[in-house]
């Protein structure tokens, strides 16, 4: 194999391996971005986060409804017999007078009356009314509304946290799929080289230049590479299945590797930024605000509750409905908890502890995110150094293989030495693809640590 051909192959491999990291921010792969947007729309885990957000929105509407009038229909009917009574001696009081009047008038206009015994339990009595209630002063429901409004912001931050984690996972899976695909290509190239060696060794054996040892060794190497290809193809399938899983689509769907992003031979420097805009910190800030509102809500027992009500209905015996049975009733209710054996105070103290606890969690998270960013940047610099080393190693391995190949074809080199050079070249190509993917993964980790991807 000529030096010119090998150089062209090396150039093609390098061009395929190098990623346009310089275009990471403003000119990122449209194909990869399209995949990310598709995941935003289809990923099941993200859908669950949106369901929780929708639930919080409805919870806020529920809290708002507590400030509006509540109308309910209430009805009851009683049938009673026996029990306590009120005895009214109407006959004893009026009958003597009625008898005297009948004698004076010589008539019976005034009948004799019986004493009455009235049941205290109403018999055959109904009461149906519409009750309208309206809170006038109630600090608890006021705080409940503010808490649920903050909870919406908390859930929205949770959605963004999941999105950023999903972006990193998708990019990492994309690079792993790329790396697995390159491994298949590299092993296929190695197989072609071994097949060429078999052809040359067969020719040498036919011409009596060498014995069958080199040919046997070449065939054994071919079987080893075939096994490596099988393993690499399996890793590629698994990487593709995981990538499709993140996008919530058929696990065997094809994956496009945008060729326009394999143009640059330069690795860009790591982006700079801070982690003070991390949505996790926004979540903790909202949780702290909710805890503070909960504390204030627990202290709201000091303010009395005041509400009003209006009843419009009808009540009478024997299901009578007329102008006499219809009625209305309006009133004002006052509730003021004056003593509860310290329950409210202890509840307020628990809420105060929650506020302090969340503040401590915020401080810890802020420091941990700084550590995460520093670690990601250190990993990036290490990955870049490894990439540069792998790049240099590939160039040296390529030159070494070309030199050994020439000497072998001239019959001045053992096949085992040529095979060693070929394996070094294959390993160098694999190492470069691994190092390249590690650089891109490190960049994705920095992007995640800085929360810099535009959602």
What are these regions (language model features)?
Residues 48-63, 162, 168-185, 203, ...:
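Amphipathic alpha-helical coiled-coil segments
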Residues 1-38, 74, 83-115, 233-269, ...:
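Terminal intrinsically disordered/low-complexity segments used for targeting and assembly
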């Amino acid at each position: 194999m000529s030096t010119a051909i090998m150089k062209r192959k090396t150039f093609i491999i390098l061009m395929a391996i190098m990623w346009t990291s310089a275009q990471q921010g403003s000119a990122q792969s449209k194909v990869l971005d399209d995949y990310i947007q598709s995941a935003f729309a289809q990923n099941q885990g993200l859908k669950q986060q949106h369901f929780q957000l929708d639930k919080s929105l409805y919870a806020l509407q529920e809290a708002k409804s507590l400030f509006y009038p509540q109308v309910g229909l209430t009805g009851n009917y009683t049938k009673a017999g026996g029990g306590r009574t009120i005895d009214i001696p109407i006959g004893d009081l009026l009958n003597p007078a009625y008898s005297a009047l009948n004698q004076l008038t010589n008539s019976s206009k005034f009948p004799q009356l019986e004493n009455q015994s009235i049941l205290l339990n109403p018999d055959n009595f109904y009461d149906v009314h519409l009750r309208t209630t309206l809170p006038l002063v109630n600090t608890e429901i006021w705080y409940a509304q503010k808490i649920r409004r903050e909870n919406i912001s908390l859930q929205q931050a949770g959605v963004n946290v999941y999105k950023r984690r999903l972006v990193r996972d998708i990019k990492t899976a994309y690079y792993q799929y790329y790396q697995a695909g390159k491994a298949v290509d590299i092993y296929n190239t190695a197989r072609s080289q071994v097949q060429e060696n078999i052809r040359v060794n067969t020719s040498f054996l036919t011409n009596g230049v060498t014995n069958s040892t080199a040919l046997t060794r070449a065939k054994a190497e071919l079987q080893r590479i075939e096994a490596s290809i099988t393993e690499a193809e399996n890793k590629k399938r698994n990487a593709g299945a995981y990538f499709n899983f993140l996008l919530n689509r058929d696990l065997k769907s094809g994956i496009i590797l945008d060729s326009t992003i394999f143009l640059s031979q330069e690795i860009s420097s790591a982006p700079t930024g801070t982690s003070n805009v991390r949505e996790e910190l926004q979540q903790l800030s909202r949780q702290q605000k909710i805890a503070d509102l909960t504390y204030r809500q627990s202290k709201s027992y000091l303010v009395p509750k005041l509400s009003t009500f209006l009843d419009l209905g009808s009540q009478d015996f024997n299901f009578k409905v007329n102008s006499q049975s219809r009625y209305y009733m309006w009133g004002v209710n006052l509730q003021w908890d004056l003593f509860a054996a310290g329950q409210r105070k202890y509840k307020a103290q628990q809420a105060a502890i929650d506020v302090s606890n969340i503040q401590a969690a915020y401080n810890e998270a802020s420091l941990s995110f700084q550590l995460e960013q520093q670690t990601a940047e250190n990993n990036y610099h290490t990955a870049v150094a490894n990439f540069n080393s792998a790049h240099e190693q590939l160039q040296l391995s390529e030159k070494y293989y070309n030199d050994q190949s020439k000497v072998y074809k001239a019959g001045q080199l053992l096949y085992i030495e040529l095979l060693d050079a070929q394996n070094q070249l294959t390993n160098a190509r694999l190492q470069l693809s691994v190092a390249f993917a590690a650089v891109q993964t490190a960049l994705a980790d920095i992007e995640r640590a800085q929360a810099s991807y535009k959602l």
